[in-house]
């Protein structure tokens, strides 16, 4: 705390404005520079628009989430193909697999793309869209001659009226010819889009429940949700093997809070109005500890008790200054809550929201929270504040700099270095030269920041901004590199991966790979 205070004092003495503020963008061929696994996006893929079978995979085209892939022989879901993989659009209209040339084609509103399996990248097709894969004509002829058509030939595409009576598990009810009733009595539909594989399985499309699998041996229907809910992601929280994803609803169903149980590869959705205790599922922030996961929403703080499997919501009735939550930070046994009208905290495990007796921040929007061993640093609409929990004291950092005094969007601490980013630029303290440095020409809208060895990362409205501290070098990653969207809201560091909550989906960027640099 004393070191940071001293650094702020030095800032008042003199601010060094760095001259090196040129931001580099992609200048190389992305398909020779990146591998297909360097950028992977998980977007809403509940509405299936096309189904095709290749040599090793069954492919599901989707309305918003690119192409889902299931390995037919090893029985696992591989990462999806999206614009991060080179597709020109995540809206897939049709799929076709050319078995002779081993090429997968995808028709999108922007044209027909083809996947090169040898070099593992997508490119515009030169000769248009070939017809979908079909059975041998003799197999179809033989099938239609049979009185008891119990087995479809491989690659056959049956209509709904050709399907047998189907059985489902306890969670769903199937009502012929195409209605699927979910556990909350919502009606979805089985589409007349599907293809049979070599193992007597029929892979089909639904209009909101993701891929469907019909085992034609016992006539059982299995629903297989394989994506985030229908949201614009705003936050990602890595909870051991579980991955929690929240955001704002895009108006489609299902929506809500998403849990990806990575060890079992199961996706679940938790929606307000359907799950008791969840008042709102438009999520802006997520944090947690070993027992609880907290979700900042547009209508208070939602808490999930993993031990009891219970949900509850905290609102102004529990003394929140505002129900519009901007950020959450678990520090020790407390949850600190940045709201649109100040800061609150909650003693984890209890139900009473606390607020400071120091009212300097009341009615001031708090955007982000950072902390060291004793102080909280708060990015607000009116500059930088700090809060001392021991003294219950709030103070404003009057730096005298335009960089710090208006609309700060992100704040961070890394190895005794204090960083701020706002409408008027970025500033940090340089320990080597014992002075503050600012980058006032970088005028982005900042939402978040994160740190990895040698790099500082900024979530902005123009992409993912990287600063190489050692080289004094800036690089801006955009959709041309592999982002799902240039609107990046949150950065979560996972070793050599960055989990990025963007408007177009959650993009996982492998920021470090030996031999790769931008």
PLM segments and residue spans:
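Sec-dependent N-terminal signal peptides
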Residues: 4-14
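An edge-strand/N-cap motif at the start of beta-rich repeat modules
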Residues: 21-77, 172, 178-195, 202-238, ...
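Short coil-to-beta transitions that initiate beta-strands within beta-rich domains
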Residues: 32-54, 82-99, 126-198, 225-239, ...
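Conserved beta-propeller blade signature
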Residues: 57-60, 103-105, 201-204, 243-246, ...
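Short loop/turn segments immediately following the C-termini of beta-strands
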Residues: 63, 109, 117, 207-208, ...
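Short glycine/acidic-enriched loop and turn motifs that connect beta-strands
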Residues: 66, 111-113, 210, 249-253, ...
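Short loop/turn segments that connect beta-strands within beta-propeller blades
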Residues: 71-75, 117-120, 215-219, 261-265, ...
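Blade-level signature of beta-propeller repeat domains, shared across WD40, Kelch, NHL, RCC1
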Residues: 484-518
């Amino acid at each position: 705390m004393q070191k940071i205070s001293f650094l702020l004092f030095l800032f008042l003495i003199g601010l060094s404005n760095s001259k090196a503020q040129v931001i580099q963008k992609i200048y190389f061929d992305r398909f020779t520079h990146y591998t297909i696994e360097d950028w992977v996006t998980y977007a809403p893929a509940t509405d299936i628009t096309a189904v095709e079978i290749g040599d090793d995979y069954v492919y599901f085209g989707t309305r918003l989430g690119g192409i889902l892939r299931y390995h037919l022989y090893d029985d696992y879901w591989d990462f999806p193909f999206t614009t991060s993989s080179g597709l020109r659009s995540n809206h897939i209209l049709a799929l076709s697999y050319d078995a002779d040339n081993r090429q997968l084609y995808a028709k999108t509103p922007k044209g027909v793309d083809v996947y090169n399996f040898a070099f593992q990248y997508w490119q515009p097709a030169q000769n248009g869209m070939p017809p979908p894969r079909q059975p041998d004509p003799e197999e179809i002829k033989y099938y239609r001659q049979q009185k008891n058509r119990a087995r479809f030939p491989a690659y056959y595409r049956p209509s709904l009226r050709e399907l047998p009576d189907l059985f489902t598990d306890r969670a769903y009810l199937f009502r012929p010819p195409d209605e699927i009733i979910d556990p909350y009595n919502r009606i979805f539909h089985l589409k007349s889009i599907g293809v049979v594989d070599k193992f007597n399985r029929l892979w089909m499309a639904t209009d909101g429940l993701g891929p469907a699998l019909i085992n034609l041996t016992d006539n059982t229907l299995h629903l297989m949700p394989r994506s985030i809910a229908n949201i614009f992601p705003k936050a990602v929280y890595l909870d051991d093997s579980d991955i929690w994803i929240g955001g704002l609803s895009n108006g489609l169903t299902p929506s809500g809070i998403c849990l990806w149980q990575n060890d079992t590869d199961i996706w679940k959705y938790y929606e307000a109005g359907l799950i008791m205790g969840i008042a709102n599922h438009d999520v802006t922030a997520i944090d947690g500890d070993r027992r609880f996961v907290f979700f900042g929403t547009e209508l208070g703080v939602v808490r999930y008790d993993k031990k009891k499997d219970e949900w509850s919501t905290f609102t102004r009735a529990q003394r929140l200054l505002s129900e519009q939550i901007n950020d959450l930070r678990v520090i020790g046994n407390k949850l600190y809550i940045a709201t649109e009208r100040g800061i609150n905290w909650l003693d984890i495990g209890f139900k009473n929201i606390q607020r400071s007796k120091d009212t300097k921040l009341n009615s001031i929007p708090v955007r982000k929270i950072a902390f060291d061993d004793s102080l909280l640093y708060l990015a607000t609409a009116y500059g930088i504040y700090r809060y001392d929990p021991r003294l219950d004291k709030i103070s404003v950092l009057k730096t005298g700099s335009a960089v710090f005094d208006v609309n700060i969007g992100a704040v961070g601490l890394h190895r005794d270095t204090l960083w701020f980013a706002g409408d008027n630029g970025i500033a940090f303290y340089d320990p080597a030269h014992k002075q503050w440095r600012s980058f006032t020409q970088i005028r982005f809208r900042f939402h978040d920041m994160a740190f990895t060895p040698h790099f500082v990362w900024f979530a902005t409205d123009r992409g993912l901004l990287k600063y190489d501290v050692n080289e004094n070098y800036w690089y801006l990653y955009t959709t041309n590199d592999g982002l799902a969207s240039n609107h990046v809201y949150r950065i979560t560091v996972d070793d050599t991966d960055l989990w990025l909550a963007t408007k177009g989906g959650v993009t996982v960027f492998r920021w470090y790979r030996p031999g790769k640099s931008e």
